[in-house]
A protein has these predicted regions:
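Beta-rich, blade/repeat-based domains predominating
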Residues: 125-137, 167-179, 210-223, 254-268, ...
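The canonical Cys-X-X-Cys-His
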Residues: 46-57, 90, 94
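Electrostatic cytochrome c docking/interface patches
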Residues: 29-45, 77
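Blade-level signature of beta-propeller repeat domains, shared across WD40, Kelch, NHL, RCC1
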Residues: 387-419
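Conserved beta-strand positions in repeat-built beta-propeller and related beta-rich domains
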Residues: 140-146, 182-188, 226-232, 269-275, ...
Length: 419
């Protein structure tokens, strides 16, 4: 008995089954990852390699030509299985097939404060400075993620000195301890590192769980304990620098993607869940995690800052909002960011009585100041375009500093007026 006989035996026409099978086959093909990508010799590589770590549709968002080159460098540094002789072909395919999409025009709003924005190119081209650090001695540090370097800029002279870390470390977050050591997350290598600037020696603290492969942002609490997020690994970590012991905590929400992290005046740790519409806190003594749901399920908080009265401010990257959470009551207030719902608010700090953040998708990127008293915004265009200010820090004098990833610069915002 052949297949047609079986089909007839259950009371169906072979022709009907053939048509149905063809329809199912076509539907399945349409649902294959990257099925709607433009044809090209590198299409298969893009689907296989990019889709190995990310939702393949992320590629459709597009980048500038230099943005795609930076992405390719990052993937190579991360250890993606890209054949060396395919790099140019893949890069050209991505540039041609997925150019940068429309970006909102920066909304520039005048106000009572004057600023001067200074920028310095970092020493290594294409290093993609990710995070800035304003050190106590007045220097500005940055993590050159794609070059595996930590850089120190003297703003007075413009002199830059870079320190190399191990290959494929992918330095990300930066913090200074009381002794002047620079701590960083090895985002590509599953580690926390400590650089002694006096000697150049780097100590590494490996994650105890291989699933915690991407340490992200970090902060010291008032007891000298280092806390850090692990975004894709869905963890928050606690490292005791005295013993090197690491404890990993798991948020109650699956795929929460812990991202920005800060500590308030009561030594309570707060972090945002970029994969969920939530802010969370950790009791440093009990290690209990409490989550604060945000009112809009589409919210995706990415960075946060502690303001006056321990109010938590956060940047809602997905919706284009600035948010305010009162942890005492759970009350949330929100304000639309000046450049609109697609402006992608990102790196932020609270200083000089105001919230300062950058709109990372506005063209050009902006520095935004929000006065909590008047609830008014003021904005400035970043002179060099910015092109993704992923994080910010504050100098001892209260000036915001930033790292401008895709234009390979670090910046200082000198505040001339206001509080």
């Amino acid at each position: 008995m052949n297949c047609s006989d079986v089909i007839r035996a259950i009371g169906r026409s072979p022709k009907t089954f053939v048509v149905a099978a063809m329809a199912l086959s076509s539907a399945a093909a349409a649902q294959q990852p990257g099925a709607d990508f433009p044809d090209g010799a590198a299409k298969g590589d893009v689907v296989t390699i990019c889709g190995g770590c990310h939702d393949i549709n992320r590629v459709k968002a597009g980048y500038t030509d230099e943005g795609w080159r930076t992405v390719m460098r990052m993937m190579q540094n991360f250890g993606a299985p890209i054949p060396p002789d395919h790099v140019t072909e893949i890069t050209d395919y991505l540039i041609k097939s997925f150019p940068e999409g429309p970006r909102p025009q920066a909304a520039l709003i005048e106000g009572p404060v004057d600023v001067a924005i200074k920028e310095w190119p970092v020493a290594t081209p294409g290093s993609r400075p990710h995070d800035p650090l304003a050190a106590r001695d007045g220097s500005i540090w940055y993590s050159g993620q794609l070059a595996n370097v930590l850089g120190r800029l003297d703003p007075a002279s413009g002199e830059i000195k870079e320190y190399h870390v191990n290959a494929q470390t992918g330095p990300h977050g930066l913090k200074e301890d009381k002794d002047g050591n620079i701590w960083f997350t090895g985002n590509f290598a599953g580690l926390i590192g400590k650089l002694d600037p006096k000697t150049g020696h780097v100590a590494e603290f490996r994650m105890p769980d291989p699933a915690a492969k991407d340490p992200h942002s970090l902060v010291f609490d008032q007891d000298g304990i280092l806390w850090f997020t692990v975004q894709q690994g869905n963890k928050v970590g606690r490292l005791d620098p005295r013993s090197g012991e690491i404890k990993l905590l798991t948020p109650p929400t699956a795929n929460a993607r812990p991202y920005g992290i800060v500590v308030n005046s009561k030594n309570v740790v707060f972090f945002v869940e970029f994969g969920a519409p939530k802010v969370a806190s950790i009791d440093p003594k009990t290690l209990q995690i409490r989550e604060y749901p945000l009112p809009d399920p589409a919210a995706r908080p990415r960075r946060l800052a502690i303001g006056q009265g321990d109010i938590v401010w956060y940047s809602d990257f997905a919706r284009g909002y600035l948010g305010r959470l009162d942890p005492a009551t759970g009350a949330v207030n929100e304000w639309p960011s000046p450049s609109g719902p697609k402006s992608q608010p990102y790196g932020m700090v609270f200083t000089k009585g105001a919230v300062w953040y950058s709109e990372s998708a506005a063209k050009p990127n902006t520095i935004v100041r929000f006065d909590p008293s008047s609830e008014k915004f003021q904005t400035w265009a970043i002179p060099g375009g910015g092109d993704i200010v992923r994080n910010m820090d504050v100098t001892p004098g209260g000036e915001p500093v930033m790292a401008n990833s895709l234009v390979n610069k670090v910046g200082l915002v000198e505040v001339k007026g206001g509080k």
